[in-house]
């Protein structure tokens, strides 16, 4: 149980991509005071968590209404996860110029969605809830742990950014990218195995 919790927490922490999004937060919030930055980070993280919970609560029923199958969830989640992994592995040293256009305080977009909770996070979460390998309580517990670790990471965004520097953060982000790419491949293999009943063995 603890091993599964650790694996899921690591997966969701990588999906929240708080380390990879540090330059984005630093660039968007640099004009605000430290106290204001902390309030914005907390608010945006809460928005991101509520968005994910909203999809967990109502998303499954909605997709069942559309007759979306488990293999479709797994395959789509794998593709989105793979796309996110490729973007993480191809990350560029600085994104500050991209966000100079935002003059006002960011509310929900782009920090809560899609920077913290994006399509890959939502689809992967729904896929894990739908396939039933892990108890839903375990998945929700892992999400809350990953969210808490992500919040702590973002609270110290400026300090971590200075400590590791751009190259150090890039190395960490690419390491997470490789892990996500492997998870994406596993999800797609699960989808093919389930759809065609070919007996692919997947460790829980």
UniProtKB/Swiss-Prot annotation:
UniProt keyword list: Cell membrane, Membrane, Transmembrane, Transmembrane helix
Topology term for the membrane: Multi-pass membrane protein
Cellular location(s): Cell membrane
Primary location group: membrane
Membrane-traversing stretches: 8-28, 46-66, 68-88, 107-127, 138-158, 176-196
An example Gene Ontology CC term for this record: plasma membrane
InterPro entries listed in its UniProt record: Multi_antbiot-R_MarC
Family statement drawn from the similarity comment of this UniProt entry: Belongs to the UPF0056 (MarC) family.
Protein name stated in the entry: UPF0056 membrane protein TC_0241
Species of origin: Chlamydia muridarum (strain MoPn / Nigg)
């Amino acid at each position: 149980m603890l091993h599964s919790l650790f694996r899921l927490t690591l997966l969701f922490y990588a999906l929240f991509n708080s380390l990879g999004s540090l330059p984005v937060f630093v660039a968007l919030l640099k004009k605000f005071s430290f106290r204001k930055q902390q309030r914005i980070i907390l608010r945006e993280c809460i928005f991101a968590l509520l968005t994910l919970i909203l999809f967990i609560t109502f998303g499954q029923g909605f997709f069942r209404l559309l007759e979306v199958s488990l293999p479709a969830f797994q395959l789509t989640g794998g593709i989105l996860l793979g796309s996110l992994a490729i973007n993480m592995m191809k990350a560029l040293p600085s994104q500050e110029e991209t966000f100079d256009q935002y003059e006002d305080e960011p509310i929900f977009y782009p920090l809560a969605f899609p920077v913290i909770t994006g399509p890959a996070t939502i689809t992967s979460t729904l896929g894990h809830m739908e396939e039933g390998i892990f108890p839903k309580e375990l998945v929700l517990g892992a999400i809350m742990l990953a969210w808490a670790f992500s919040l702590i990471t973002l609270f110290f965004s400026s300090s971590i950014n200075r400590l590791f520097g751009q190259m150090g953060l890039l190395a960490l982000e690419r390491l997470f990218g490789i892990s996500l790419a492997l998870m994406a491949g596993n999800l797609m293999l699960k989808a093919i195995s389930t759809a065609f009943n070919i007996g692919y063995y997947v460790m829980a």
